[in-house]
Regions:
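Extended catalytic cores of very large enzyme megasubunits
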Residues: 1-197, 203
Length: 205
């Protein structure tokens, strides 16, 4: 459903405002949380739509609305606000719609793309084979990002995620960040010489 308002997408395209998509996004942010209401978030936002409003502005208004609803009686709005913030981060990093956020690109693709962007050091490829990067990817649990509170996720986005500070474009999600920090720290770790190896055995305990 559209009210005729034109919105500016992150990539610069102009499209008709899809109110249904906005409603679904807020509802998704509230899914599984007790004591929260998607309609309350939308009403609290008091969004004044105008031609040319950006999707980023709409996202920020909704995040602020959910944040303003956080109280001792309604603490779960901190997770609603965090999820709305996360949807925006995922949109930038995955380049996909929020509702397709479970279609995650593999770590290897993120590494190569961010090397091309100049935000990851290409030297990391000298220490890890593709198979090892794929194995690292298998350890990532993206749904862990849904456990952040709003304050916690905002701190990570503002201070720790790799991004272009001039445009605020973000290049990684928290789970990708954690994995890349670990991979970078242990890239030169002399596992064999220190004999710090864990080998699987068939011994019953």
């Amino acid at each position: 459903m559209s009210n005729g308002t034109k919105v500016k997408k992150r990539d610069g395209r102009i499209e008709s405002l899809d109110l249904d998509k906005m409603h679904l996004m807020v509802e998704e942010a509230c899914t599984g949380l007790a004591g929260v209401s998607a309609s309350q978030v939308e009403m609290k936002s008091g969004i004044q739509f105008y031609d040319g409003i950006t999707t980023g502005e709409i996202q920020e208004i909704l995040i602020r609305s959910a944040s303003d609803l956080i109280s001792l009686d309604n603490p779960n709005y901190q997770f609603v606000a965090a999820r709305l913030l996360l949807f925006g981060v995922q949109k930038q990093v995955f380049n996909t719609r929020w509702k397709d956020s479970e279609i995650y690109p593999p770590l290897g693709d993120i590494v190569l793309r961010n090397i091309d962007h100049g935000v990851y050091d290409k030297d990391i490829l000298n220490y890890y084979e593709k198979e090892e990067i794929d194995q690292c990817n298998s350890f990532i649990r993206h749904n862990r990002d849904l456990t952040f509170t709003y304050a916690g996720l905002q701190q990570i986005v503002d201070k720790y995620l790799v991004q272009d500070r001039s445009t605020n474009e973000v290049f990684e999600t928290p789970q990708f960040m954690y994995m890349m920090i670990s991979a970078t720290l242990f890239a030169k770790y002399p596992t064999v010489s220190y004999t710090h190896l864990t080998l699987p055995t068939n011994r019953e305990v």
